[in-house]
């Protein structure tokens, strides 16, 4: 996975259902603080059991989530998000997310997650 120090765009983030209702200035601030990363097919974005301090949204490609004991847990497509449990609860990653195709994700750090994203889960 190679981070490109290019922020996500407001347009990209507005396609994420969780984020779509954010006010324009808030989604713009979030976009500036997210880092875009290209992921090769077959590569893991996060690994179950690892420390997790980033929240991710899928911008392109198809990824799968799986757990060692339960197997496949789902497919992630553009507009989906993952990685919220670890930073929200301070626990290790609960699943491995791997790219099935070349993919692009954008992620933010725990501070940004706590400030902008976490309140969206309170509803």
Model-predicted regions and their roles:
Residues 1-123:
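Cytosolic regulatory regions built on CNB/CRP/Popeye-like sensor folds
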């Amino acid at each position: 996975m190679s981070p490109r120090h290019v922020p996500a765009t407001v347009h990209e983030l507005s396609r994420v259902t969780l984020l779509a209702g954010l006010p324009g200035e808030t989604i713009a601030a979030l976009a500036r603080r997210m880092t875009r990363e290209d992921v090769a097919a077959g590569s893991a974005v996060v690994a179950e059991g690892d420390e997790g301090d980033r929240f991710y949204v899928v911008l392109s490609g198809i990824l799968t989530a799986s757990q060692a004991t339960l197997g496949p847990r789902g497919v992630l497509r553009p507009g989906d998000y993952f990685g919220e449990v670890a930073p929200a609860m301070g626990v290790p990653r609960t699943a491995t997310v791997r790219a099935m195709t070349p993919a692009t994700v954008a992620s933010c750090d725990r501070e940004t997650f706590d400030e902008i994203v976490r309140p969206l889960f309170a509803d």
